[in-house]
Amino acid sequence: MHSSSVHVPLIEFLKNRIYLGAYDHHKRDTEDLAYFTVEDALPYNAFYMDFGPLNIGHLYRFAVLLHKKLNEDSTQGKGLVIYSSTSPKERANLACLLCCYMILLQNWAPHQVLQPIAQITPPLQAFRDAGYSSADYEITIQDVVYAMWRAKERGMIDLAKFDLDEYEQYERVDQGDFNVISKDFIAFASPQQSKRGGLNEPFQKVLEYFVENNVQLVVRLNSHLYDAKEFTKRNIKHIDMIFDDGTCPTLEYVQKFIGAAECIINKGGKIAVHCKAGLGRTGCLIGAHLIYTHGFTANECIAYMRMIRPGMVVGPQQHWLYLHHDDFRSWRHTMIVDNRPDPLIGNLFPLCSYEDYKQRLKEAKRKERLQLQQQLTSPLADSSVINTPIRRRKVSGALASKIQTVVPIESPGQPRKYFEDSEDIDEVEMVNNSDDENTMQDIIQSSPARYDSVTPKTKDNSDWRVLRSISTNNVSSQQSIHIIKTTTTKTVNETLSSPPGTSPTNVLRVSKARSKNRIASGNSQTSRAHSGGVRKLSGKKH
């Protein structure tokens, strides 16, 4: 192969097929080599002292020209030397284009494309920012290569689907001056209105594109140069997150921005961000989200954005992105979109610490449980909500007097009873079992209208029996009483006094022999008091 007339080595990428060279004069083809340059066809449009890297539109055009040259008959069987001038800047731009081509179209790994250009002499110049100050931060071809590789792996770039016409149209100032950075973000320069309601052509292009491409949020970072209603009346949400030109946002601002962006992305929409030129402040916030989402390093992020929109991230903003790129990547695992809206970002939701979020949820659940317990245990809840209130009936005096002579006021429940009989005791106790273990007393009163079927049919005051409740009734105060005591285990019938008229206590006494006749061993007999109620007496002799 022919040696170069200058001291720049010929770099082999594909043996006998693709080489990288540098010459200060036009080279003619030889029998072994064909020469090809794109330096004049793909110029870089500088802002100030910046010179590259060439953007993705240049990369697409380079790939088209290279494929065309490789397929020409004149290059068949020859090595193709792609060359530039010997300027370090031009050499760097061409080397960067060729490396990105090998990454995106030939699917080479980063180390494969970096190995041929490693430690070459003279070295390739690093890229600087578009600012007017001295360049104190640089990115290298290695940063660009890894940026393109990561973007390809994350599905952010596909040259086979790239629309060159659209890209080159809208990057022009008179056509809107915006670029689609990723499927989620658009970076653009601030639209301007000379008067309210008037739309110039660039602003009209921006509005039309945003409506057609589902842009749901516009974030303004600079002072007002247009009426935000131009977006909102087209159903595009608009928020202001203004900070000074050339400065960097606070981390709190970045958290709010990323949270707001996540809210829109989760709904399938896009976010458009602008400052005055759509480069510095815009690059800070979009870059922070790219690092948060895709794991770029700061240098990779800057390189990627400049490949899409040249000049992004200026001056100290480069250092800021480098200092905080670890924070942005860690937020992916330590922060979450909050559930409390933030008025600063149009009531969208910012990022918040995952631990704080969990603690707040626990505290909210604890307060909710405590409030529920207080409602359940409050007297008002017990009486008016849970339990139905008991309504007590009022009974007149005349009716109460009649009830007393007919049935007991309180029921003994469901008794289980038996007799205890003793030869040495003249009276027999009847103990009635009750479920609530309260002693109930029923007064058995003799009645002149009914006779016992067991005892002789002679009118005797001791034979008259009815049921009445304990009360102070003047009419029956001179009559005999019989008391039945009720407990949970037995029923005992006890005669408390002698027949009526013989004792001031007026308690009926029943003889032992008579008790045995009324309750026979092995038989169950019923004694009815027809005037008031029924008392069933049963039991065995012990």
From Swiss-Prot:
PROSITE patterns: TYR_PHOSPHATASE_1, TYR_PHOSPHATASE_2, TYR_PHOSPHATASE_DUAL
Top-level taxon of the source organism: Eukaryota
UniProt domain Tyrosine-protein phosphatase: residue ranges: 177-334
Induction, as annotated: Both during budding and hyphal growth, no detectable levels are observed in G1 cells but, as cells passe through S-phase, begins to accumulate with a peak being reached during mitosis.
GO cellular component: cell septum; cellular bud neck; cytoplasm; kinetochore; mitotic actomyosin contractile ring, intermediate layer; mitotic spindle; mitotic spindle midzone; new mitotic spindle pole body
Entry-linked Pfam families: DSPc (PF00782), DSPn (PF14671)
Database matches in SMART domains: DSPc (SM00195), PTPc_motif (SM00404)
Active site per database record: C275
Phenotype when the gene is knocked out: Leads to defective cell separation and impairs hyphal growth.
Keyword terms, alphabetized: Cell cycle, Cell division, Cytoplasm, Cytoskeleton, Hydrolase, Meiosis, Mitosis, Nucleus, Phosphoprotein, Protein phosphatase
Presence of the UniProt keyword Transport in the record: no
UniProt biased composition (Polar residues): 518-529
EC number: 3.1.3.48
Modifications made to the protein after synthesis: Mainly phosphorylated as the cells are passing through mitosis in yeast form cells. Phosphorylation is delayed in hyphal-induced cells, indicating that the timing of cell-cycle progression occurs with different kinetics in hyphae and in yeast cells.
Keyword Protease: no
GO molecular function: protein serine/threonine phosphatase activity; protein tyrosine phosphatase activity; protein tyrosine/serine/threonine phosphatase activity
Reaction(s) the record says it catalyses: O-phospho-L-tyrosyl-[protein] + H2O = L-tyrosyl-[protein] + phosphate
CDD domains on file: CDC14_C (cd14499), CDC14_N (cd17657)
GO terms, biological process: autophagy of mitochondrion; cellular response to glucose starvation; cellular response to osmotic stress; DNA damage response; hyphal growth; invasive filamentous growth; invasive growth in response to glucose limitation; meiotic nuclear division
Region annotated Disordered, chain positions: 516-542
UniProt family annotation: Belongs to the protein-tyrosine phosphatase family. Non-receptor class CDC14 subfamily.
Role noted for this protein: Protein phosphatase which antagonizes mitotic cyclin-dependent kinase CDC28, the inactivation of which is essential for exit from mitosis. To access its substrates, is released from nucleolar sequestration during mitosis. Plays an essential in coordinating the nuclear division cycle with cytokinesis through the cytokinesis checkpoint. Involved in chromosome segregation, where it is required for meiosis I spindle dissambly as well as for establishing two consecutive chromosome segregation phases.
Protein name: Tyrosine-protein phosphatase CDC14
